[in-house]
Amino acid sequence: MKTTLLSDLPNGTHATVQSVIAPSSQADPALLRRLNELGFIRGEPLQMLRRGPGGREPLAVLIGESLFALRLLEAQCIQVLPA
């Protein structure tokens, strides 16, 4: 299967983190570090639970037993491999 961005996953999709990347040269290195500290690390399974109103922000993402509400910009930094 092909990798995609977490921000592009449909609701309910299971996936595995492949990498945390800067989507542009404007990305804040502190943001990438924070995502790694939260558990978005290579090989970690996750599930995109649902999106906010209108299919936008926040994105509810489950890693292990931890639930995170991510902004679209944050989700665009996470490459995943859908299950």
Task: Give a label for each model feature.
Residues 52:
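Small/polar glycine-rich anion-binding or flexible loop at a beta-alpha turn
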Residues 1-36, 41, 47-49, 57-83:
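Compact, charge-rich alpha-helical regulatory domains located at protein termini
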